């Protein structure tokens, strides 16, 4: 009986820890949608819709993107700062790609994050927390 209680007590104590270590794939994903590419003088402007259905506010959500031309060659590497990313909120961010024609953009790769923090603390596996889509002619993927 004493052994049974000790095991039960150990399980009860570890249960909150298991809940706290839920993986980034659990729960709702942050949606990133490449909505539109617009030609501008000297380049291309991208409109990205961010949908954060979670209760988490991100102080920094800074993307590393690689832009591939229609032939599959990397045209541009971009650091896109998105700060803050508020909980339960949809926002649109624009970023300009100089010296890149919108017609030449074939794919945009979310290669990773330069910085991903919440409450001043680094957030693990930010790439796993997002779901990508595109309404533009270019593919948006990770």
Which residues are covered by each model-predicted region?
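Intrinsically disordered, low-complexity Pro/Gly/Ser/Thr-rich segments with frequent PxxP/GP/PP motifs
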Residues: 71-104
